[in-house]
Amino acid sequence: MTIAVFPGSFDPLTNGHVDLITRASRMFDQLIVTVGKNTSKQGLFTTSERVAFIEAAIAALPNVTVQVEQGLTVDFMKSVQATVLVRGIRNSTDFEYEQGIANLNRHLAPQVDTACLMADPQYQYVSSSLLKEVARFGGDLKQLVPSMVAKAMVARLEGDH
């Protein structure tokens, strides 16, 4: 049985994330989506809120679970016997960044392989900072994030401009 892990901060969860999770769920026996905190970014949603958004979005995917992760992803992977780390790639900048992380992870945990999935072209330009800016100024988020996330973003950022 192949267990894969798809880590991220998911702040906010995007339709691009949901697309990658759905595609990865078809490739592996079990997929664990891990929610972590990106210490270099100001958070919009709490960890609990992000977990709830993901769980709602993936409810129809029986082989996908969501867990909170603190620490090194490869250490978490060892603890659940996962052997594949799934990453989404939007552009060449993402690729170069992920290549460096994959090499480091391979050094720390030789049993871990990284599988990079190319983002669907309709989501290649989407980033969390861009989405927050769109929400702050009342832009339409319907095609970019799940509806529950769009509503929560508008409520959270209302009057923040």
From Swiss-Prot:
Annotated gene: coaD
Residues the entry annotates as binding substrate: S9, K41, T73, R87
Gene Ontology biological-process entries: coenzyme A biosynthetic process
Subcellular localization: Cytoplasm
Enzyme type, top EC level: transferase
Domain of life of the source: Bacteria
EC number: 2.7.7.3
Reactions catalysed, as given in the entry: (R)-4'-phosphopantetheine + ATP + H(+) = 3'-dephospho-CoA + diphosphate
Cofactor(s) recorded in Swiss-Prot or TrEMBL: Mg(2+)
Gene Ontology MF terms in the entry: ATP binding; pantetheine-phosphate adenylyltransferase activity
Identification of the protein by name: Phosphopantetheine adenylyltransferase
Alphabetically ordered keywords of this record: ATP-binding, Coenzyme A biosynthesis, Cytoplasm, Magnesium, Nucleotide-binding, Nucleotidyltransferase, Transferase
Native source organism of the sequence: Levilactobacillus brevis (strain ATCC 367 / BCRC 12310 / CIP 105137 / JCM 1170 / LMG 11437 / NCIMB 947 / NCTC 947)
Oligomeric and partner information: Homohexamer.
Similarity comment text for this entry: Belongs to the bacterial CoaD family.
One Pfam family from the record: CTP_transf_like
Function recorded in the entry: Reversibly transfers an adenylyl group from ATP to 4'-phosphopantetheine, yielding dephospho-CoA (dPCoA) and pyrophosphate.
A GO CC term assigned to this protein in UniProt: cytoplasm
Site (Transition state stabilizer): H17
Database matches in InterPro entries: Cyt_trans-like, PPAT, Rossmann-like_a/b/a_fold
Record: residues binding ATP: S9, F10, H17, G88, I89, R90, E98, Y123, Q124, Y125, V126, S127, S128, S129
Pathway(s) of this molecule: Cofactor biosynthesis; coenzyme A biosynthesis; CoA from (R)-pantothenate: step 4/5
